[in-house]
């Protein structure tokens, strides 16, 4: 199963406005992916339009967001249904600081409706930390029925290793995201408590432009998919 589970839409200010739900799903089809997920910064408000676009395109989808914790660690919350993902929004809203977005500096935060028609904008800046710890964020994702994946774990910005220095043992995450398969050994070499075979490893694009969506190159077995999702899908 070829996938890309870390893609931003035009709701994320750092993404291009071309990243509309239909464009994302159609590019995933062009690139012959089997599974795609939408993961905007600190918001699931693009999920309804994305769910409609994925259904129209006939592509398998997961629904999510990329949450920034109080420690400035990025965590992907992935959900099997739009309803589960949307249930997280009130929790996010309560913990997100009321900082207005400066479109001239950060970019647009566009919310789409049917056929990618822009129906609104998110007025609060999404590139902020929530008033929630890493542990609380992982726990809330689980409570909503989702899976928590530590994003780009070796990046120099907003990764768990950059912000905390290491991946905490005992943290109940469901998967680790790396940017390339060769990063796996670096994680294992520096974290002896992480076992290769019992960990779900994801290689995603973190796409902010259509061209950045993964090619048909990163795959997971049905067994790995079931290990991540169990009977949820």
Regions found by a protein language model. Name each.
Residues 80-122, 166, 224:
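Active-site gating loops and adjacent loop-to-helix segments of metal-dependent hydrolytic enzymes
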Residues 108-143:
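Alpha-helix-centered segments that form part of catalytic cores
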Residues 1-5, 9-33, 44-90, 125, ...:
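Charged catalytic cores and adjacent phosphate/nucleic-acid-binding surfaces used
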Residues 37:
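Conserved Rossmann-like nucleotide-binding pocket used by diverse enzymes
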């Amino acid at each position: 199963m070829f996938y890309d589970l870390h893609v931003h839409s035009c709701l994320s200010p750092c993404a291009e406005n071309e990243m509309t739900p239909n464009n994302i799903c159609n590019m995933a089809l062009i690139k012959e992916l089997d599974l795609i997920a939408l993961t905007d910064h600190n918001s699931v408000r693009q999920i309804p339009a994305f769910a409609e676009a994925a259904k129209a395109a006939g592509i398998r989808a997961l629904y999510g967001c990329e949450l920034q914790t109080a420690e400035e660690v990025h965590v992907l919350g992935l959900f099997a249904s739009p309803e589960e993902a949307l249930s997280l929004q009130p929790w996010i809203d309560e913990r997100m600081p009321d900082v207005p977005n400066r479109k001239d500096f950060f970019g647009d935060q566009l919310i789409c409706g049917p056929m990618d028609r822009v129906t609104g904008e998110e007025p609060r800046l999404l590139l902020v930390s929530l008033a929630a710890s890493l542990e609380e964020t992982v726990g809330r994702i689980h409570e909503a029925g989702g899976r928590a994946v530590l994003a780009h774990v070796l990046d120099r910005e907003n990764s768990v290793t950059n912000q905390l220095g290491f991946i905490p043992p005992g943290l109940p995450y469901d998967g680790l995201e790396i940017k390339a398969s060769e990063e796996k050994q670096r994680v294992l070499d520096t974290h002896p408590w992480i076992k290769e075979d019992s960990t779900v490893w994801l290689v995603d694009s973190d796409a902010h432009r259509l061209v950045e969506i993964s090619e048909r190159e990163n795959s997971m077995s049905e067994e790995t998919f079931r290990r991540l999702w169990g009977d949820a899908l």
